[in-house]
Every structure is written in structure tokens, then in C-alpha cells.
Amino acid sequence: FENVLYPNIPSLLNSLKEQGYTLVIATSKPTIFADEILKYFEIHHYFDCIVGSNLDGTRSSKTEIIQYILNKYKDHDSSEFIMIGDRRHDIIGANNSGIDSVGVTYGYGSLEEVKSSKPTYIADSVEQLREIIINSK
């Protein structure tokens, strides 16, 4: 896999699950591949739902994926959702869907890319991400 599991992510996921958060993956990757990546890194069990693109190329934009998730969890208010992403399309998808977002600067996107997409919050570390999530509850 070309993916990297950032230090302290398993600890953060475990902490959020213990606090009762519902964790959902919203990825542009096909769902089946995202599922395999999560299993490879042994973090699959933290997630309640994994939503990606379909193998036929449909539901491929981040906005479509987030809208699908919001519809699936329509018993939750949109203010309860926060999109965490490292690329502009993650943040734009959140903005288009009316939910808060955290742009993380330690992923694949540059600081400039993340900032220019206007996230609600910016996190430079997993610890900052943890603080943002807990304080935005």
C-alpha cells in the first residue's frame, strides 16, 4: 500500500469510539479498496461505515459521498458532522454540504492547498486534531 498510518491515529480513533463518536470514512477511493486499506492497518473496527466511490465510477465526488453519508445518518443534525481531510476536495465537499471541516497539514496536500479551500479548522498534528474534535462537540 502507498498509504501511511500516522502516529497516534489508532489512539485517537480508540478515544473517540470510547467517547461514543460515530466514525465514518468518506473517500474518493472505491469503497472496496478503502475497506482493504483499513483492514491492512488494523483500524477497520473503529469505523461504523465506509463510503467511497462505486466501481462503476459513480458517486466519485467528495460532495456526493458526503451527501450520501448525511442522508444515511439523517437522524443526526448536520452540525454533528465534521469532515477531516488533507486535500482541497475534502474541504470543498464539506463546504458544499454545509458541514464543518478540519484541514490537516500532515497529509498529502500542502498547507497552501488546505488553507485555500477554507476549512473551518486547521490541524498541524494529530494532537491538534484531537483537541479540535473534542472542543467542537
Describe each region flagged by the PLM.
Residues 1-25, 31-35, 63:
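Short, acidic loop-to-helix structural element flanking the phosphoryl-transfer center
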Residues 4-8, 29, 86, 106-109, ...:
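Short beta->alpha linker loops
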Residues 8, 33-36, 93, 113, ...:
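Phosphate- and divalent-cation-binding pockets in alpha/beta enzyme and binding domains
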Residues 10-18, 70, 91-95:
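Surface-exposed amphipathic alpha-helices with a cationic face
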Residues 44-59:
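A short, structured active-site edge motif that brings together acidic residues
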Residues 62-91:
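Conserved Lys-Pro-Asp/Glu-containing loop-to-beta segment of HAD-superfamily phosphomonoesterases
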Residues 82-123:
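Acidic, Mg2+-coordinating phosphoryl-transfer loop and its flanking beta/alpha structural elements
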